[in-house]
Amino acid sequence: MYRFCTLFSGSSGNSTYIGTDEHGILIDAGKNAKQVTLSLLEEGLSPDCVEALFITHEHSDHIGALRVFCKKHGIPVYASRGTLEALDKGGHLNGDFPVYEMSEFADVGEFHIECFHTMHDAAESMGYTVELENGFKAAVATDLGVITDEVRAGIIGCNTVLLESNHDIGMLSNGPYPYPLKRRI
């Protein structure tokens, strides 16, 4: 039996668990490690069943638990080259856990994970499809401003799809972004 659990979604943090009761992966870990752990436990999942963390992009609401959770549980991190470079520049990759560049696909335990580019104001934002050995296939794409042809191609054939986006005019108007960016958004 597969599990697809949105642990959190939104500007305060994003994280999704895909797998079974015994083994799975996280896509993003956007709150602190304690909150990620508690959310997993609330779903009846042990944090030790997480075999890898896949990062969609480097924004804080997607990586809050990255260092502490991955170090504590000894799990690897997968992300695009651009995201890994941004994470390294920001001091988020400290050598306490394995890091892998995600360019096309990865196999982690019984999971086959493929990536596709998404359009977002980040170094190299990605969405992921996850296929289990039993044929169940799920996709996660976050912070979508537009669904591109590449996103469409990435989600075709999935049993479950999580498309996440939000648009808060007040947050945008009062935020730190320069006017041309605010206008484009």
List where the protein language model places each region.
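Active-site metal-binding motif and surrounding structural segment of the metallo-beta-lactamase
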Residues: 33-79
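Metallo-beta-lactamase
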Residues: 80-135
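Active-site glycine- and acidic-residue-rich loops that bind
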Residues: 140-152
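Conserved beta-strand hairpin/beta-sheet module of binuclear metal-dependent hydrolase folds
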Residues: 1-43, 126-143, 160
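Active-site neighborhood of phospho(di)ester-bond hydrolases with catalytic His/Asp-centered motifs
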Residues: 26-30, 51-58, 78-81, 139-142, ...
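Active-site environment of divalent metal-dependent phosphoester hydrolases
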Residues: 60-63, 84-86, 122-123, 146-148, ...
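Structured catalytic core of nucleotide-sugar glycosyltransferases
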Residues: 5-15, 56-66, 84-88, 113-116
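Cap/insert and terminal regions of metallo-dependent hydrolase folds
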Residues: 150-185
